[in-house]
Amino acid sequence: MLSNQTIEIVKATAPLIAETGPKLTAHFYDRMFTHNPELKDIFNMSNQRNGDQREALFNAICAYAANIENLPALLGAVEKIAHKHTSFLITKDQYQIVGKHLIATIDELFNPGQEVLDAWAEAYGVLANVFIQREEQIYQANASQEGGWRGLREFELVGKQLESEHICSFVFKPTDGSKVTKYKPGQYLGIYINSDKFENQEIRQYSLSSSVQENTYRISVKREQGGKVSNYLHDELNIGDKVKLAAPAGDFFMDVDTNTPVVLISAGVGLTPTLSMLESLTEHHAPVTWVHATENSKHHAFKEHVNQLVTAKENMNALIWYNQPTAEDKIGEDFHFTGFVNLHEIEAALKQDNVQVYFCGPVGFMQHVAKQLQELGVPQEQFHYECFGPHKVV
């Protein structure tokens, strides 16, 4: 527990931190990577360059300071971050390194005096212990399951298939020939790439894009313009190549009984976690509505596969939006609507009792979806979303 003195000091200095903005976390990361360059093998340096990770950490620090007297309010954020940390295999020692550089950053930017530094050090220590304990629980849970493991495990690429103009699926099988641990539909897999093409080890998380299989994992990756790892996977990773994987993780997953109505909404490569959910609903009794938005048929991944899943079940329905259909794309056959997703078209599905809505896609798309869900009266506790990359509130 934090002392009252520490709480008051953190509250008093929080406005100064907030006023500084992401400059604080920029200084922190620059300092940490200078003194501990080995951490460049852990952090996504692309997110450092575009500022996303710096903004995410700054927002987390501000949220912690704002809720210093109400830590339970942070449990949702802690769960999300803890899962991501286990995919990076974060250790207790690394928390100590981060704490050292965070306190040094506050000292160098503000020179607030030892009392303030001690208060922030105490506050950081309490939060770090919360993460360390939760992450240890996740590590142990993963390792204790059948087919589970802790740390990294070697897999072989046994399948590679282009799903659209920009999305390719990769199927991995463990080289030891044993089973793989089960996961919850919507979770992701951590992939570790070491190549002489990269200055540092690169770690990425990709949503598992199929229902649970006994011996394999499938991810489906969009080729991002300028994306180091996505382009490497598309162009360089071939059948028979070996990679190291961390166990499945993530707090975005579907957990419903067979009588709960489900709506799955996605845009672009955001369909990967929702496809895993859809494949897992083949024995579902309640209505299932699939909504997907993409540019046109050239970008429409898993089109035939989803059609087969939906047409095989009377309780499933699919609606497709194309933003820029080609001359060959036929409305009513390839897609149903043009432009941006309008959830009023599925208002009846969203008005069902206890309907659970899962959505994923670009941040702007998810903000558009969340706004419509609120307008249609869907309770916030009944919709769930996933951001690819550092988390953003929609």
UniProtKB/Swiss-Prot annotation:
Q: Where along this sequence does the record place binding of FAD?
A: 188, 204-207, 387-390
Give the GO biological process terms: cellular response to nitrosative stress; nitric oxide catabolic process; response to toxic substance
Catalysed reactions, as listed in the record: 2 nitric oxide + NADPH + 2 O2 = 2 nitrate + NADP(+) + H(+); 2 nitric oxide + NADH + 2 O2 = 2 nitrate + NAD(+) + H(+)
Spell out the PROSITE patterns in the cross-references: FAD_FR, GLOBIN
The gene designation is: hmp
Role: Is involved in NO detoxification in an aerobic process, termed nitric oxide dioxygenase (NOD) reaction that utilizes O(2) and NAD(P)H to convert NO to nitrate, which protects the bacterium from various noxious nitrogen compounds. Therefore, plays a central role in the inducible response to nitrosative stress.
Segments for region (Reductase): 147-394
Write out the entry's keywords from A to Z: Detoxification, FAD, Flavoprotein, Heme, Iron, Metal-binding, NAD, NADP, Oxidoreductase, Oxygen transport, Transport
- Identify the residues that the record assigns to the FAD-binding FR-type domain, covering every copy: 150-255
The first-level EC class reads oxidoreductase
Residue positions annotated to bind NADP(+) are 268-273
SUPFAM superfamilies in the cross-refs: Ferredoxin reductase-like, C-terminal NADP-linked domain, Globin-like, Riboflavin synthase domain-like
Its recorded name reads Flavohemoprotein
Which residue positions does UniProt flag as site: Involved in heme-bound ligand stabilization and O-O bond activation?
29
Q: How is the cofactor bound?
A: Binds 1 heme b (iron(II)-protoporphyrin IX) group per subunit.
Give the residue spans that cross the bilayer.
Answer: none
Enzyme Commission no:
1.14.12.17
Q: Which Pfam families match?
A: FAD_binding_6, Globin, NAD_binding_1
A molecular function (GO) term: nitric oxide dioxygenase NAD(P)H activity
**Residues at the site labelled Influences the redox potential of the prosthetic heme and FAD groups:** 84, 386
Against PANTHER family, the record matches this protein to:
FLAVOHEMOPROTEIN
